[in-house]
């Protein structure tokens, strides 16, 4: 299974592609899609969609994973992000790929073992989980890899959820369950 994780933004969009085969994960690629800073929002969204289509054509993912929409205090920013997310979803759906969405807490829980982790904690954990020498930069890229990892973790690519049961309750039992699920991280 090959999953493309996408962390959408109007100025830069992170992406990360992870393949899972026989229980082993490998990063196929990751980076940023950066529309021209001088363009209007509509032009940047168009460039983002073109860049995303190129990533999908090159990496050939079987599914795409996104973080659910986050609504902060800035209404204008939330509206812009909503437009960007809508364009990303439309692009992916147009190309016939399934889309799965995960709450930020689900992603953090899958990567670090705690849903309250900071972005930097997610970034520092991913190299250990994915066999990387160091965490890719910037955080938009590690966020995208974390989203893809969440989708692939614990069979999520087959069940459509990350660490959650149908009732919405976490399957995690805390650090003990995380350590049991990731013995390769023990020194």
From Swiss-Prot:
Q: Write down the EC number.
A: 3.1.21.10
Compartment list: Cytoplasm
Please list the residues that make up the active site. 7, 67, 140
**Molecular function GO labels:** crossover junction DNA endonuclease activity; DNA binding; magnesium ion binding
Q: Which cofactor does the UniProt annotation name? A: Mg(2+)
Q: Mind telling me which InterPro entries this protein's record contains?
A: RNaseH-like_sf (IPR012337), RNaseH_sf (IPR036397), X-over_junc_endoDNase_Mg_BS (IPR020563), X-over_junc_endoDNase_RuvC (IPR002176)
- Provide the function of this protein: The RuvA-RuvB-RuvC complex processes Holliday junction (HJ) DNA during genetic recombination and DNA repair. Endonuclease that resolves HJ intermediates. Cleaves cruciform DNA by making single-stranded nicks across the HJ at symmetrical positions within the homologous arms, yielding a 5'-phosphate and a 3'-hydroxyl group; requires a central core of homology in the junction. The consensus cleavage sequence is 5'-(A/T)TT(C/G)-3'. Cleavage occurs on the 3'-side of the TT dinucleotide at the point of strand exchange.
The name under which this protein is listed is Crossover junction endodeoxyribonuclease RuvC
């Amino acid at each position: 299974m090959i999953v493309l994780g996408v962390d959408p933004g109007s100025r830069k969009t992170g992406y990360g592609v992870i393949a899972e085969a026989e229980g082993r994960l490998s990063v196929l690629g990751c980076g940023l899609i950066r529309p021209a800073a001088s363009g209007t929002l509509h032009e940047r969204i168009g460039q983002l969609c073109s860049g995303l289509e190129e990533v999908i054509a090159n990496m050939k993912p079987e599914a795409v994973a996104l973080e659910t929409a986050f609504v902060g205090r800035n209404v204008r920013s939330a509206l812009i992000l909503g437009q960007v997310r809508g364009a990303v979803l439309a692009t992916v759906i147009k190309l016939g790929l399934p889309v799965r969405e995960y709450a930020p807490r689900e992603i953090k829980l899958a990567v670090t073992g705690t849903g309250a982790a900071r972005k930097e904690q997610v970034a520092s954990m991913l190299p250990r989980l994915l066999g990387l020498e160091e965490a890719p930069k910037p955080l938009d890229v590690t966020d995208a890899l974390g989203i893809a990892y969440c989708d692939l973790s614990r069979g999520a690519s087959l069940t459509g959820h990350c660490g959650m049961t149908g009732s919405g309750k976490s399957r995690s039992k805390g650090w003990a369950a995380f350590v049991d699920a990731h013995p390769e991280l023990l020194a």
